[in-house]
């Protein structure tokens, strides 16, 4: 059984493979430095096994962003502004320095977060009975896609052979504002969904792990929106994955999951404290 913390198990898993899709999960342990170490393990294992094409699921790097006021954002205890981005971004170096033939895949936000329990923008019913998506994004656009379509784009990259090796490929189905997300979910559910655009300070004060990091992420998305969206190539994404679903198509296909998630959120909210 492969373990991201143990290089030898990864080497055994990669043995004889032509390609390897490599990804880590920050939210399993909430440690950016551990995620970077796991990336190094994946890169070393791919090198040892002689993988011909690795796809490394990376992320943007908050170190490349400077606020319009020149201010630093609040940092996590280990010095990261957006740890769930930065640990992956710093992992890029392992693949390049080891000479692993790698495509650096930059996937957009998963729309599945809309029905993921505990996600900041899970669709939930408010005290007034109205469904809402709550985000500190103002009118900023956010590249997004369904998780399954990320896999299909990766398959397209493997099929392309060496064409994208050594390049960073940002994939997304479309870029949507919070209001557009709410409208698509509303259409799928046949019920009004409101977009609550909240200030960043509300998120920073929220009682969930990594609240500062989530607020930092949305601050970057909002303040550098054109540059942020520019990392994602919608036309290339569709050429890699001709079945790529639009937001409306994804919402319609996931109507039941959205309904189940909302029901669970309602029950949790109604539990006595």
For the regions a language model picked out, list residue spans one by one.
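Short, basic/glycine-rich phosphate-binding loops at helix/coil junctions
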Residues: 20-21, 231
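Short, charged low-complexity linear motifs
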Residues: 42, 91, 96-97, 230-240
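A hydrophobic C-terminal alpha-helical subdomain
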Residues: 164, 200-273
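NAD(P)-dinucleotide binding in Rossmann-like oxidoreductases
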Residues: 196-198
